[in-house]
Amino acid sequence: MELSEHEEDAGDVGGGCSSPPTPPHRVLTSAAPETIRCRYHECLRNHAAASGGHVVDGCGEFMPASTEEPLACAACGCHRSFHRRDPSPGRAGAARLPQLHLPASINSRAPPALLLPPAAAASKQGLPFPGYGTPSGGTGTTTASSSDERLRPSPVQPRRRSRTTFTREQKEQMLAFAERVGWRIQRQEEATVEHFCAQVGVRRQALKVWMHNNKHSFKQKQQQENRQEQQQ
């Protein structure tokens, strides 16, 4: 009785009724998303762009102003986008690409053309696309000096102050006012100074600077005129 059961099992195996092999399956695994911490260095904002010059404020590194305004720099007050962005120092980890896992049977039967040596694979990835990176469409590569020149900040140039120009009538009125107050603005005369500036059309700070710059020259000129009158 037991012999007949074994014979039936053997007949089932040899009859060709076995289930077909399962097709190879691919399993894609990707690493958890890793945050890239970027670091922002010196401020590259051109404060003299309106006048055609190039002046930076000299801020060396971005510092958040507060939790309410995290994108404003506490040192220079500029937006974070004006600072040079460098993701490499604060990078938490290299981004991992999805890995392709194949069954061992498929990897063992892979054609030789798909299994490239490490050196050949690296050289193949390093070749640029034709027509990209060179004017002639060749296979030239860009040098590291060009990228360094873009990232290198320009030297800080001294900011030129715009000089205020006065008309001849304004100079005569300011000279008469300066001689009347003794070439010195007192605190008791603030109302008089404000009224004079509004009447002549000059700013108070401009009047103060003009009196400071021309005080000695006009006094020397007046002294010379007095000496000439006494000699005559």
UniProtKB/Swiss-Prot annotation:
Localization recorded for this chain is: Nucleus
What InterPro entries has UniProt attached to this entry? Homeodomain-like_sf (IPR009057), Homeodomain_ZF_HD (IPR006455), ZF_HD_homeobox_Cys/His_dimer (IPR006456)
Q: Which GO terms describe its biological process?
A: regulation of DNA-templated transcription
Q: Which residues bind DNA?
A: 159-222
Q: Which domain of life is it from?
A: Eukaryota
Q: Where is this site: Required for DNA-binding?
A: 211
Q: Where is the composition biased (Acidic residues)?
A: 1-11
Q: Which UniProt keywords apply?
A: DNA-binding, Homeobox, Metal-binding, Nucleus, Transcription, Transcription regulation, Zinc, Zinc-finger
Which cellular component appears as one GO term in the record? nucleus
Q: Which GO terms describe its molecular function?
A: DNA-binding transcription factor activity; transcription cis-regulatory region binding; zinc ion binding
Report the stretches of sequence that form zinc fingers (ZF-HD dimerization-type): 40-86
Chain intervals for the UniProt region annotation (Disordered): 1-25, 126-170
- How does it associate, per the subunit comment? Homo- and heterodimer with other ZFHD proteins.
Domain free text? The homeodomain differs form the typical one by having namely 4 instead of 3 extra amino acids inserted in the loop between helix 1 and helix 2.
NCBIfam families attached to this UniProt entry? homeo_ZF_HD (TIGR01565), ZF_HD_prot_N (TIGR01566)
The task this protein performs is described as: Putative transcription factor.
Q: Could you tell me what this protein is called? A: Zinc-finger homeodomain protein 5
**Which species does this protein come from?**
Oryza sativa subsp. japonica (Rice)
Supply the source organism's classification. Answer: Eukaryota, Viridiplantae, Streptophyta, Embryophyta, Tracheophyta
Q: Which gene encodes it?
A: ZHD5
